[in-house]
Curated annotation (Swiss-Prot):
Gene3D superfamilies: Pseudo beta propeller, receptor-binding protein prd1-p2, domain 3. SUPFAM superfamilies: Adsorption protein p2. InterPro entries: P2_sf (IPR036325), Phage_PRD1_P2 (IPR015297), Phage_PRD1_P2_C (IPR015948), Phage_PRD1_P2_N (IPR015949). Disulfide bonds join 254-277. This is Adsorption protein P2. It comes from Enterobacteria phage PRD1 (Bacteriophage PRD1). The gene is II. It holds the Pfam family Prd1-P2. Adsorption protein. In association with P31 and trimeric P5, forms the spike complexes located at the 5-fold vertices of the capsid. Involved in recognition and attachment to the receptor on the surface of the host. Likely triggers the processes of vertex disassembly, membrane tube formation, and subsequent DNA injection. Essential for viral infectivity.
Length: 591
């Protein structure tokens, strides 16, 4: 399996990502397991790293690797953790303080490296979920670049201590943890700087070597000076390659030597489940169903790929939030009643939560669901057509004051589903056609729950004004976006500016004719990349055009493309940020 160091200061990391679309799921009590990988930062609804420990234990042991806490007899435990490209350790590991000091020489009593209340900027000014717990966590806006982990049965514990080689399980030849560093299979967590780029925090870890990052200024655009920061890193992608399985009945002996081209399983009357003969340790055996003769095998083959990312920064903060993948195989088709929310492989409990599976893939995996609770609402959304945006999810915390109109709209726009009852009843969902969208006939005086007919089929979508940011000197007038999944280069924008609705394609000039509403919010999908932009018109009068486009190289699946956002505007403030904040800019790209 892949090993990589949690980086020391100034060391750029190498992550491991597993391309596991074709990896079979193991439904038996033997075979492989998904390793719980806690990639959310310290304070994402859970109250800090320590609180995450209790939540990890909620994994279904029949489908997940059980969480083994650190004990006197098991000092290592099974602790998965995450890190970010600049070396800041944001862990759920129980020895977080000592590891902080040992690896980074950081005194936890010093000024935090990251803003403990950064989330309040994008959570409508509500810092409820962003209190600092002493672990330099970054609040609830740290959705991470999720690495899918596929492990053999009985994996070694993840720890900052080297395991005794004598404790290795049969067939395991190399420990995942070494004494000269901490190894993880977790991926890259997102990060937020709490100072403007012109005032670097002396406590920040040094930037990577100059050959990797490129820092170049851009002109000031209305509110504060903006800059763009580009960097790159390598990702080891493990792809599943299947190996034939041969069943033999009542053999006298197994082959003398392990084989690398197939797995031999011998079955007897006393053991119809069968037991595999010795084979190469790198082969993973998966028993898919209760039928003992239904088993597959394969290996994960590594490929190193380069990733390049451009980040646009401005003013107070910036963050990188690449997409994550949800692999839960225990989502039921029916509404889930428990007061828990699972995001990726992370489970937590909300103070007052409800969520429903809006759509499943037919195998128990959710393709679209929402969760809400407390002062924030999170929607994890996947577009229907994986061939367009792959498995693009993103989280959208909102302060809605009890209104779920924006969530309804998000589900409608991004999932092609709309709960006609206005509630979380999946039985009332209607499919929204993604073609013939030009036939929108808005009603007079649109409101949050007004329905707009899309075509003659009777399907509906809801539109609403999303959320206001008066403290940021601009607000969102409201928008919605649809995409033709068969032709992703043709995107239709539906913009409300007080005078009516407008539809146009990407690259066209967007105009506002009514100076009563001086801002516009829009989404755009193109070539598998979504970016959110917001513009404020600083003076009324003639309409001011906005031109923008995303240049997305045609990279294969498994690559994070280099994204260059070109923009040209007059009297416009372009405020890029992470994907969570509606009304501000940002980009996310597919894995």
């Amino acid at each position: 399996m892949a090993n990589f160091n949690v980086p020391k200061l100034g060391v750029f990391p190498v992550a491991a990502v597993f391309d596991i679309d074709n990896v079979p799921e193991d439904s038996s009590a033997t075979g492989s397991r998904w390793l719980p990988s806690i990639y959310q930062g310290g304070n994402y609804w859970g109250g800090g790293p320590q609180a995450l420990h209790a939540q990890v234990s909620n994994f279904d042991s029949s489908n997940r690797l059980p969480y083994n806490p650190r004990t006197e007899n098991n000092p290592a435990g099974n602790c998965a953790f995450a890190f970010n490209p600049f070396g800041q350790y944001i862990s759920n590991i129980s020895s977080a303080q000592s590891v902080h000091r040992r690896i980074y020489g950081i005194d936890l009593n010093d000024e935090p490296l990251f803003s403990p209340n950064a989330a309040s900027i994008t959570n409508g000014g509500n810092p409820t979920m962003s209190q600092d717990t002493g672990y330099h966590n970054i609040g609830p806006i740290n959705t991470a670049y999720k690495a899918e982990i596929f492990r053999p049965v009985n994996p070694l514990p993840m720890s900052d201590t080297a395991p005794d080689p004598e404790t290795l399980e049969p067939g395991q030849t190399e420990p995942l943890i070494k004494s000269d560093g901490v190894y993880s299979n977790s991926g890259i967590a997102s990060f937020i700087f709490d100072r403007p780029v012109t005032e670097p925090n002396p406590n920040w870890p040094p930037l990577p070597p100059p050959v990797i990052p490129i820092i170049y200024p851009t002109p000031a655009l209305g509110i504060g000076a903006a800059a763009a920061y580009g960097f790159g890193y390598q990702v080891t992608v493990y792809r599943w390659e299947e190996i034939p399985v041969e069943f033999i009945a009542d053999p006298e002996t197994c082959p003398a030597q392990p084989t690398t081209d197939k797995v031999i399983i011998r079955t007897t009357d006393l053991n119809p489940e069968g037991s595999p003969c010795a084979y190469e340790a790198g082969i993973i055996l998966v028993r898919q169903t209760s039928n003992p003769m239904n088993a597959v095998a394969g290996r994960l083959v590594p490929y190193v790929e380069d990733i390049a990312v451009d980040i646009f920064l401005t003013g107070k903060f910036f963050t990188l939030n690449p997409p994550l993948r949800i692999t839960n195989n225990y989502f039921a088709d029916d509404e889930v009643k428990e007061n828990t929310v699972t995001i990726g492989n992370y489970t937590t409990t909300l103070s007052s939560a409800y969520y429903a599976v809006y759509k499943t893939d037919g195998y128990g995996g959710a393709t679209c669901f929402i969760a809400s609770g407390g002062a924030g609402i999170s929607a994890l959304v996947q577009l229907q057509d994986n061939s367009v945006l792959d498995v693009l999810y993103y989280s959208l915390p909102l302060s809605l004051g009890g209104s779920k109109a924006a969530i309804d709209e998000w589900v409608a726009n991004n999932c092609g589903l709309f709960p006609m009852s206005g509630g979380l009843d999946k039985t009332t969902l209607l499919e929204i056609p993604r073609r013939q969208l030009e036939a929108i006939n808005p009603q007079d005086g649109p409101g949050q729950y007004d329905l707009f007919i899309l075509d003659d089929s009777g399907a509906y979508a809801s539109f609403s004004s999303f959320i206001g940011y008066p403290e940021a000197a601009y607000y969102v007038a409201g928008a919605a976006t649809f995409m033709d999944v068969e032709n992703p280069d043709e995107i239709i924008f539906i913009l409300r500016n007080g005078a009516g609705w407008y539809a146009c394609e990407i690259g066209d000039a967007l105009k506002i004719a009514d100076d009563e509403f001086d801002s516009v919010d829009y989404f755009a999908y193109r070539g598998g990349v979504m970016f959110i932009g917001s513009a404020r018109y600083t003076e009324g009068g003639d309409p001011l055009p906005i031109k923008y486009r995303a240049i997305i190289p045609g990279l294969p699946r498994g690559r994070l493309p280099r994204v260059v956002l070109e923009y040209q505007a007059v009297g416009m403030s372009f405020i890029p940020c992470q994907t969570h904040c509606l009304g501000k800019g940002g980009i996310i790209s597919k894995v």
